[in-house]
Amino acid sequence: MFRDGLRQLIDREPDLVVCGDAATADEAMRGIGETRPDLVIVDISLAGASGTDLIKGIKSQHEDLPMLVVSMHDESLYAERALRAGAMGYVMKQEPAKTVKSAIRKVLAGDMHLSEKLASSLVSRFMHGAPDQPARPIETLSDRELVVFRMLGQGKGTRQIAAEMEVTVATINSFRNRIKEKLNLKTSTELMLHAIQWVQGEASR
């Protein structure tokens, strides 16, 4: 649904056109190879993959292709990960249409797009040095662990997550154990409740 809305928003602009879209990372990589776009818009939430993994994959094969992340997820947690992976901008879906269009044009022109809040945070971290410990325990999770945590919070079971991520159940169980350790959660029930609460909090932003 969001892809359709974004397509309509872009296609209404006389100087912009959508040459394709994709629901999965594999579809995206194939489409990029076939259409050779000037810009790729990435959502952090992908079926069976991390958006940051896709960004890294695109960067490895198309080094000069600019990427903009448009996501519902809190920029304070995801934006720096996306930028480190190779994205040139991050804008939240809740932003006005004019902000999204401005971000697209800035990244197309070779500039970075960051919100004032995010830019200020990054400058502060650079000037004063990154803290020894992440501000929130959730920030200690790796990209893949964060994907698993989000899927758990969406009510998906271990087997479903394994199928969507195309890994074994044992791998997902390993992720679950590492997440519990990093978040100081003792039981699987605590993990599920914590994940659900976090996903609901993200949705209400």
Question: Can you say where each PLM-predicted feature lies in the sequence?
Answer:
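The feature encodes the CheY-like receiver
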Residues: 2, 47
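Short hydrophobic/Thr-rich beta-strand motif most characteristic of the beta2 strand and flanking loop
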Residues: 15-23, 31, 185
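Acidic catalytic/metal-coordinating carboxylates
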Residues: 24-27, 50-53
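Active-site residues of response regulator receiver
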Residues: 43, 71
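Short amphipathic alpha-helix used as the core "switch/output" element in two-component signaling
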Residues: 52-64
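Short, flexible helix-to-coil linker/hinge segments that flank and couple to helix-turn-helix
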Residues: 77-84, 89-143, 147, 189, ...
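Helix-turn-helix DNA-binding segment
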Residues: 134-171
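Basic, Lys/Arg-enriched C-terminal extension of HTH/homeodomain DNA-binding domains
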Residues: 177-205
